[in-house]
């Protein structure tokens, strides 16, 4: 029989059954009752597994050492989880932690940071708790029924020509391609222009190697991307010119085209913005992905170029249907959309097929 008693602002629950005596403290009476009922059912069915008496902080440490280190996005996840380990939530025992604790954490974080940041941290926490279930420490993810913060509207900020010119000027990159880039600052300017021409992510640009560039076909192959899939990106005339300019500083010791890590690219770009007085202009390097390609390329083709798996994100955030003059572009592409089809016909999309809900359905193999 469970005993639930209020002690100050908290609720103390105790279960004694079949020789097992367990207790825990909760923020709400409802959470205390739920825990007690779940424990009693487990004891009655013989499925009871004792939850180890470790704190969330200790659990985070185990997860970082065994799981995070195996991920491609380990740096970002490590930063988020270490930040969580410094919150009051981290000191709570796994035997006691419940939805109310996570709700209190969520509400407090929303006072400190943006909903987007909270969503990312919540995602890392949820992955941590899911792994905890796999380790047989708990049987249910306490975040499962916790309401997510409402995501903000997609970013639509785009660079204007004046901002592009200012950033290139302060980088010292020679757009006339006479003087080769000599510093990381110069290379950052080149990477910025290359991003505008290709819609590639900063990490993809930083990891781009010479052996994956085909000058004859005017393409570059990305063996691994953010979503875990490879893709081939067509290169515009300007993108090819930038790459040809960078061949003058190509070295045998470093196969990377821009010779810097993603962190260096991010740091140097922030430095350029500060030098030019644009640090408060609400501009991110990632905003280059909605620049010229969004103006010139059909949304279906753009999805294949940019690597987006979700067409709704692409259309809401990046796509600008300003294509009245056709698809023969200054960038060097000749991309004519399939006649008779539109985004309204869209039904399903992945890296292999586009299926349209016409009658009869049309399947296009990519």
Curated annotation (Swiss-Prot):
Highest taxon, organism lineage? Bacteria
Q: Which UniProt keywords apply?
A: DNA integration, DNA recombination, DNA-binding, Viral genome integration, Virus entry into host cell
Database matches in PROSITE patterns: CB (PS51900), TYR_RECOMBINASE (PS51898)
What SUPFAM superfamilies is this protein classified in? DNA breaking-rejoining enzymes (SSF56349)
A family per Pfam: Phage_integrase
Q: Where is the Tyr recombinase domain?
A: 168-331
Q: Which residues form the Core-binding (CB) domain?
A: 54-133
Q: State the active site.
A: 201, 226, 308, 318
The terms under GO molecular function for this entry are: DNA binding; site-specific recombinase activity
Q: Name one GO biological process term.
A: symbiont entry into host cell
Specify whether DNA-binding is a keyword of the entry: yes
Tell me which InterPro entries the record gives: CB, DNA_brk_join_enz, Integrase-like_cat_sf, Integrase_catalytic, Integrase_recombinase_N, Tyrosine_recombinase_XerCD
* The keyword ATP-binding belongs to this UniProt entry's keyword annotation: no
Family according to the record: Belongs to the 'phage' integrase family.
- This chain belongs to the protein called Putative integrase/recombinase HI_1572
